[in-house]
Amino acid sequence: MTDLKASSLRALKLMDLTTLNDDDTNEKVIALCHQAKTPVGNTAAVCIYPRFIPIARKTLNEQGTPDIRIATVTNFPHGNDDIDIALAETRAAIAYGADEVDVVFPYRALIAGNEQVGFELVKACKEACAAANVLLKVIIETGELKEEALIRKASEISIKAGADFIKTSTGKVPVNATPESARIMMEVIRDMGVEKTVGFKPAGGVRSAEDAQQFLAIADELFGADWADSRHYRFGASSLLASLLKALGHGDGKSASSY
């Protein structure tokens, strides 16, 4: 197996196969769930809006893949600093049956100098998730934070507040996951000594098998080749799947999606 094939198989099994579009429908979510079951293995999860969780659960069970996890998003994509709303949305997502919640950190508040609201928001959502055995991923929106110091600070705050994963991006802003921001965030995980309990998720802009290989190489460099399993690493993507399958000898590499 070539290096690209090996990394592509790894990446496929780490994917949160995603559709977060305004025109999402039950039919599109059903199709996404079907795509998550591939000839070479299943993706780690699907990531969808909360209202589609019941139809996704039904579809995943019916196709014999109940182990594919269901992730959803809250405080999304705006990352406002209203803790009550973020918490209410997170509780609603849990009530819908989410296995994982990806909440957007109040990044604009941090840019304006407010570190406390981000900590409190993540902490509140973590308490709700922990009570229901739901994983919490925190989206810090690196492409808007821009500066290394802010990316580092948002990562640190999220981890201190209880994040199970730190995630680069919503996929809804001009700049999403980059190798540079990925390295900064994983270095924070390393520097804080939390690599056993905190994972990393690049999202948006990871579109090709070669992209995925590059992102995995950073994780392998920092933590060794065994770290990036589905408890410690995910890719938030949709168009990536077709490229990975093509690298693995399945399909033509074409995808209808841009995430």
Swiss-Prot record:
SUPFAM superfamilies: Aldolase (SSF51569)
Top-level taxon: Bacteria
GO BP terms, alphabetized: 2-deoxyribose 1-phosphate catabolic process; carbohydrate catabolic process; deoxyribonucleotide catabolic process
Catalysed conversion reaction: 2-deoxy-D-ribose 5-phosphate = D-glyceraldehyde 3-phosphate + acetaldehyde
GO CC annotations on file: cytoplasm
Protein EC: 4.1.2.4
Annotated active site: D102, K167, K201
Pfam families tied to this protein: DeoC
Pathway assignment: Carbohydrate degradation; 2-deoxy-D-ribose 1-phosphate degradation; D-glyceraldehyde 3-phosphate and acetaldehyde from 2-deoxy-alpha-D-ribose 1-phosphate: step 2/2
Keyword Zinc-finger: no
Keywords: Cytoplasm, Lyase, Schiff base
Gene Ontology molecular-function annotations: deoxyribose-phosphate aldolase activity
Location relative to the cell: Cytoplasm
Keyword presence, Cytoplasm: yes
Role description: Catalyzes a reversible aldol reaction between acetaldehyde and D-glyceraldehyde 3-phosphate to generate 2-deoxy-D-ribose 5-phosphate.
PANTHER family: DEOXYRIBOSE-PHOSPHATE ALDOLASE
Family: Belongs to the DeoC/FbaB aldolase family. DeoC type 2 subfamily.
Protein name per its UniProtKB record: Deoxyribose-phosphate aldolase
Organism: Klebsiella pneumoniae (strain 342)
Gene, per the UniProt record: deoC
